[in-house]
Amino acid sequence: LMKKVLFVGLLACVALSTAAKKKLAITMTGENLATLTQVTDNQEPCLDPFGGDNGSALFFSVRENGKYFNIYKKDNPFSAAMSQKTSGKNNNRTPCYNPATGKIAFSCRQDGASSADIYTMFDSKGKALSQITESTDAFEEYPSFNKEGNLLVYDKIQRSYYSKANFASFFGFGYSTIVVENSEIWLRNLKTGENVLLGNGYQPCFSPDGKRIAYVKYSSDAKSTSIWIMNIDGSEQVQLTDAKKGFALNPRWSPDGTRLVFQSSKKDKKDADLYVIDVDGNNLTQLTINKSYDGQPYWTTDGYIYFVSDRGNNVGNYQIWRFKYE
């Protein structure tokens, strides 16, 4: 298998064109985010925002003691209080929440473990966990629920496909490079326990109607990543973006399912910006233009985009921000 280079953590992604191989003009009007607001102001980085729809709970991960990560929740995005949902010397990352079931799903790499698994827990029942996947030689991460909460999609990367020199940094923090030969997207039926392999890819995300999945895939030359969509049975895989010298990561759906927001940067840059594209590959628009890292977006049902950034005076200390986008 051809090796693929993945910049993990906060290094992101790309310059683009479309699935139809036609050149796309990028709309760039300059950063004009009148509603831009900082949501967290923590001494340590806050990552992986999920939620905040119509002022509801916001879930995210927080680095602790410069090493570990745990999942936290704000009942209101702008409340000062944060409740801790996970604990211990683990790396608990990429939370997602399903309102229909009241469950949180996240990826956990326990201290000293050489793998990571998907866990779920009821938001209202504290820290009682249910282990969904069980692997001793793979990283399983980026869970995403369908609307009903009975299906969970996630990615899986075999432990042997990582560069041993960089393995320790995968669920850590920073710009470390990890060599990946293959990543897979799996669909789990939470009622029956059935697992189905959908194909190769990374960072899957269910569409609002539960009929499609957005995800990241490597180019054939292994020098870039692009955004794709497919049906939930793995059929009709369509490429939306094409980056020859960069990376596109973290696709998230608009509330109506017609657009995707994602982060993008050239591979020789540590900064990243946010972009929006229609699901037919048209109307690529750059949202942020900043020398900081702007990534890990989440698009709420009331039109806000939450994202992670070290802009302003927070260079190196990544916090959660949001702005209104219709």
Where are these regions (language model features)?
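Multi-bladed beta-propeller domains
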Residues: 22-45, 74-91, 121-139, 180, ...
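Hydrophobic h-region of N-terminal signal peptides that target proteins for export
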Residues: 11-18
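Eukaryotic tandem repeat interaction scaffolds
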Residues: 195-266
